[in-house]
C-alpha cells in the first residue's frame, strides 16, 4: 500500500503571536476556524518573527535568511526568487504548491497578481490561488 503525504498548510497572519488565538487560551480572540485547524495540526508555539514589517518577515520565511543577509527592509527584492526558497524545496519533494492572499514578493503597484505569475513560479509556487 502506498503511503500518502500529509498536507502542508502554512498560515501566516502578519506577525500574529501564537497566543492570540482561542486554541492558545486567549479569552478575547474569537478564532473558531484557526481553533479547528490547530486541533488537527501543528502550532509553532516558540516561533518568532524576524521583523515587525510584513514584507521583511515574509522574505526571511521564504529564503531562510536573516534580514541582514537578504537586505530587504521595506520592499522585497525580486532577484531573491532565484535563490533558496522553502516553497521550491516543498515542490521539489513532490508537493503541489500554491499561494492565497497577499505575499509582498515584489513591490505593490496595484494591478493583478497574475501579472507576476512567472515570478511566483520562480519562487516555487505552482499556482496563485
Give residue spans per PLM region.
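Formylglycine-dependent sulfatase
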Residues: 1-129
Amino acid at each position: 500500500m502506498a503511503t500518502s503525504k500529509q498536507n502542508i498548510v502554512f498560515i501566516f497572519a502578519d506577525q500574529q503571536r501564537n497566543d492570540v488565538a482561542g486554541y492558545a487560551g486567549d479569552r478575547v480572540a474569537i478564532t473558531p476556524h484557526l481553533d479547528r485547524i490547530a486541533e488537527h495540526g501543528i502550532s509553532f508555539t516558540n516561533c518568532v518573527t524576524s521583523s515587525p514589517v510584513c514584507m521583511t518577515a515574509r522574505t526571511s520565511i521564504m529564503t531562510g535568511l536573516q534580514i541582514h543577509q537578504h537586505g530587504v527592509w521595506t520592499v522585497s527584492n525580486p532577484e531573491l526568487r532565484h535563490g533558496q526558497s522553502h516553497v521550491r524545496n516543498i515542490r521539489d519533494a513532490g508537493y503541489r504548491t500554491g499561494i492565497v492572499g497577499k505575499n509582498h514578493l515584489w513591490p505593490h503597484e496595484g494591478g493583478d497578481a497574475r501579472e507576476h505569475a512567472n515570478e511566483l513560479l520562480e519562487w516555487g509556487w505552482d499556482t496563485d490561488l
